[in-house]
């Protein structure tokens, strides 16, 4: 979805086996509908959700509300079973910004930090969603 909004590379993937090879996210150079939007994230937003969050922020599409993402962005190989029932996966592709910063281990920050409130949730309210709606309403003309 982000690729329809941007014509310059905003993220690269680097292979462990070929450190000098960098692959950009696919780029679509069509037209995009520009509407007000807000992105919600939390510490459970991982993998492509973190990539989407990074692109959303870099492209200045709108504010990001909630909590920083977890920082889990590596591409891994197949699952290798262990004798005790566990297993391992080997990371082989890292996701890198144009400035060379790896996303792995560094949660994507938010513009409006709103911690989940379990008491509000028990009352039938979602304080993070409420904050996101407030931010969106500021942008609707």
Protein language model regions, located:
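Gly/Ser/Thr-rich loop/hinge elements
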Residues: 1-40, 44, 73-82, 92-96, ...
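Short, well-structured beta-strand/strand-turn elements
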Residues: 59-73
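Cysteine-centered nucleophilic/redox motifs
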Residues: 37, 45-60
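Intrinsically disordered, Ser/Thr/Pro/Gly-rich linkers and terminal tails that flank
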Residues: 1-7, 13-16, 48-54, 67-68, ...
């Amino acid at each position: 979805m982000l690729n329809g909004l941007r014509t310059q590379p905003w993220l690269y993937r680097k292979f462990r086996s070929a450190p000098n090879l960098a692959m950009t996210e696919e780029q679509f150079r069509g037209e995009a509908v520009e509407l007000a939007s807000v992105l919600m994230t939390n510490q459970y937003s991982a993998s492509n959700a973190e990539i989407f969050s990074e692109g959303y922020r870099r492209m200045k599409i709108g504010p990001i509300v909630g909590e920083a993402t977890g920082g889990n962005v590596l591409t891994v190989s197949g699952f290798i079973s262990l004798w005790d029932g566990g297993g391992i996966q080997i990371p082989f592709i890292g996701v890198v910004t144009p400035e060379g910063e790896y996303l792995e281990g560094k949660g994507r920050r938010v513009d409006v930090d709103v911690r989940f409130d379990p008491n509000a949730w028990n009352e039938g309210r979602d304080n993070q969603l409420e904050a996101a709606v407030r931010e969106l309403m500021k942008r609707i003309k």
